[in-house]
UniProtKB/Swiss-Prot annotation:
Glycosylation sites: N110, N122, N133, N300
Source lineage: Eukaryota, Metazoa, Chordata, Craniata, Vertebrata
The protein's name: Neuropeptide FF receptor 2
Membrane topology classification: Multi-pass membrane protein
A GO MF label: opioid receptor binding
Family: Belongs to the G-protein coupled receptor 1 family.
Intrachain S-S bonds: C220-C308
Amino acid sequence: MNSFFGTPAASWCLLESDVSSAPDKEAGRERRALSVQQRGGPAWSGSLEWSRQSAGDRRRLGLSRQTAKSSWSRSRDRTCCCRRAWWILVPAADRARRERFIMNEKWDTNSSENWHPIWNVNDTKHHLYSDINITYVNYYLHQPQVAAIFIISYFLIFFLCMMGNTVVCFIVMRNKHMHTVTNLFILNLAISDLLVGIFCMPITLLDNIIAGWPFGNTMCKISGLVQGISVAASVFTLVAIAVDRFQCVVYPFKPKLTIKTAFVIIMIIWVLAITIMSPSAVMLHVQEEKYYRVRLNSQNKTSPVYWCREDWPNQEMRKIYTTVLFANIYLAPLSLIVIMYGRIGISLFRAAVPHTGRKNQEQWHVVSRKKQKIIKMLLIVALLFILSWLPLWTLMMLSDYADLSPNELQIINIYIYPFAHWLAFGNSSVNPIIYGFFNENFRRGFQEAFQLQLCQKRAKPMEAYALKAKSHVLINTSNQLVQESTFQNPHGETLLYRKSAEKPQQELVMEELKETTNSSEI
């Protein structure tokens, strides 16, 4: 990330046309330089020597303090132009001596006895005289205002993630009647999102506002592994929820998943997450950056820069692994979620309810509103997943495959990557809101867990589940009886009985929709 700040020390841009070459002016400058040396000071002492020059001397140099300052501010984004401004300010005689010295001597970059003017270019400190291109970066990568925006933004999603997912876990584990297949998937989603909040958000924020890796090699591997596993488990759980909802709505007559099967699927999710992220943990190492040092304070105290990064044998292997992660953690889950929710939406749209009778008309309007609400919810779920993770994966693919300029990479790493991470982690903050608090059963479980009373007393959840189970049995029995009578009377009454058989099946579909709406299956 910080490898795009520096430029080779040999690429200095000299501008001598602004300095007068008249013999009297050269002699005058040499006399001033000699008088300064006789007083015990250096031939050039930066801004102090500039202040000692008379106004006439500054006019003869063709520069004034204001002109030089404005020239510096206009060109501070280009290192070459910044050094050009420095060479303008150096007296000609002293500049010539230093040019000869640079050609004949090698300066020690860590020696305090040598003369090392340091200039701030994009918050980066450069040693102008150095045979080794060492770039000095500030410990904090951003101004305090920008860092405050990052901290507040990350703290907001961290707070929502921790509070929301903790409440979801508490509700599901506290109420035994909520131990259903879908709720177990939601519980697993909340656990993985909690891991994202604990291990991903603080470390990513720290990495985005300071230079280097402040922890050791063990923490580098553990944090990288846990971050990858938690993100992968969260995405895989979203796919499991989509498949479970798809089976309940599109194929309501097929056997549903059992609690035991749900536990097996959850174990498979975590095993897959560990397997796909293990190569990253193996390749993660803390490495010292040879050409960069961190400037810790205003007294020019510095320290080495360490990075926690993947050390692949070659760039092609890194590209292959990035592509595998992109396909398995974003592209394939996204395709499955869109396909499953698309099929659910089509099934809801095609579901028919009898239109005859005033009661049926009212039922139709109620069902129509429920269908619209459910379809909107499915669209929101799919769009949030797409928009949350697309920027981060796009940046990761661009970093590995696109031929970006150093300036583009610098902007991406310092400003765009923090926003992309924030957007991706925000998905873990909104998941408990979408999958938990938007359904009636979780609100009821929240009320029971914290013993809250509403104005209207509601039936106990166990009784509600029992009534739903009885209604399912009655609907299935009536459906089978009607189908049997249809086969026994294949002539004139077939159409009548076929219409009769259609109603229980549609009622069953709408009952499934109602149940999934209330128990997070839609």
